[in-house]
Amino acid sequence: MALRFYNTLSQQVEEFTPASDNTVRMYTCGPTVYDFAHIGNFRTFTFVDLLRKVLRANGFQLNHVMNITDVDDKIIRNAVAQHQSLEQYTKIYTEAFLEDCKMLRLERPERIAPATEHIHDMVSAIERLGDSQHTYASDGSVYFKIASFPGYGKLSHNDFSGNLAGARVDVDEYEKADARDFALWKTPKEGEPFWDTTIGPGRPGWHIECSVMAIKYLGETLDIHAGGIDLVFPHHENEIAQSESLTGKLFSRFWLHAEFLMVEGQKMSKSLGNYYTLRDLVAKGYEPESIRYLLASVPYRKSLNFTLDGLKAARIAIERLRNFKRRLETEPFAEGLSAILAERTAQASQAFIGGLNEDLNTAEALASVFEYVRDLNSAMDSGEFRAGNTTAALEFLARFDSIFDVLKPTAKAGELSDAEIDAQIAARAAAKKSRDFALADQIRDQLLAQGIILEDTKSGVRWKRK
């Protein structure tokens, strides 16, 4: 079953294979560490994590580089305002970001590349761009001449040929209407940090950082470059201009971009009170796996409306899957094998990977999982399920969780573990056997008070969390 992605560059869904050998050379834009990352950021980072896992599920090896932008306009402004060095300021938020990634179960890329560790490489690249007549200097800064690169606009599919030659933009982020020659190297303002280099004192512009680190670690042509939709212009457009001017080769074969996230139907904003970091939501009692599930549940090219009700629904969905897994592991089924259910498991597995392979259609993949769970729960209730079907069903769930990674609960202070619940159920069974019904009822009530619901069935006791 072919793996296909929508390529922003071609505006088409294309079959994907690496350019050479079996290794995917992938670069993704990481955080700008000027503050705690918010859930809009983590929508993109969760998409990248799913992308990694789907690539691996298709048998590919990964060489994935993610940058850390630890010098840019916002960082410098905030560090200066707080009277901290650049290193002191960014260390706080870099460590916080990595902790949040771990909490959200995001795999660590093969290489994390902080921009400030590559200043010499950036200066060298700027000098080479100057040697090939792609730059000019003005007031101590160095700018890229967008008129020197005929392909400028091919990623965002805009025509910038009529832009005024020599007009400049100094900020890192700007709109298409303000497309101008952009800064590769910025002369420092009074009080700002800077590096003394062969092209003068200053610091790099945002866009040159990613070009240089991507080429250094992955080569002149990447297989995949991914990020948020907001980076298509100017950041990724400028990366292409710089990189292809440096190498004369296609910078990346595939460009993948995750759509925006809304919160309660509105743009996320601190002024609206709907601005959430991962830490905000966890402090409110929402489990990281519920947040991960909600972020992953909508296909990456569709806008996601993130709501607190959606988080509650995500928890219910996850508990349904956990309860199904628990039934498979604990209920005594009749011996034998149902050929019909074996075929149903094979169909579900094919539908699951088929959805993911069609441009990471997570909604279709999840639908196949829940239809399967419904069918097998019905088979268990009717007595059709056989012990010989258990292993394949558990393997299917494991395959699901190797991508979505939500089945293992995050430990909470004071919350009973599965093993503790099973021990209480065993104690209740022993009390009932010895006809101590008062103790059995007491154990049941204590479990209920802790959010555990017991259900007595013909095949034994089932339990689930509220």
Curated annotation (Swiss-Prot):
Gene3D superfamilies: Cysteine-tRNA ligase, C-terminal anti-codon recognition domain (1.20.120.1910), HUPs (3.40.50.620). Its EC number is 6.1.1.16. It is found in: Cytoplasm. ATP binds at K270. Its cofactor is Zn(2+). SUPFAM superfamilies: Anticodon-binding domain of a subclass of class I aminoacyl-tRNA synthetases, Nucleotidylyl transferase. Binds 1 zinc ion per subunit. GO terms for biological process: cysteinyl-tRNA aminoacylation. One of its GO terms (molecular function) is zinc ion binding. GO terms for cellular component: cytosol. InterPro entries: Cys-tRNA-ligase, Cys-tRNA-synt_Ia_DALR, Cys-tRNA/MSH_ligase, Rossmann-like_a/b/a_fold, tRNA-synt_1_cat_dom, tRNAsynth_Ia_anticodon-bd. Monomer. PANTHER family: CYSTEINE--TRNA LIGASE, CYTOPLASMIC (PTHR10890:SF3), CYSTEINYL-TRNA SYNTHETASE (PTHR10890). This is Cysteine--tRNA ligase. The lineage of its organism: Bacteria, Pseudomonadati, Acidobacteriota, Terriglobia, Bryobacterales. The gene is cysS.
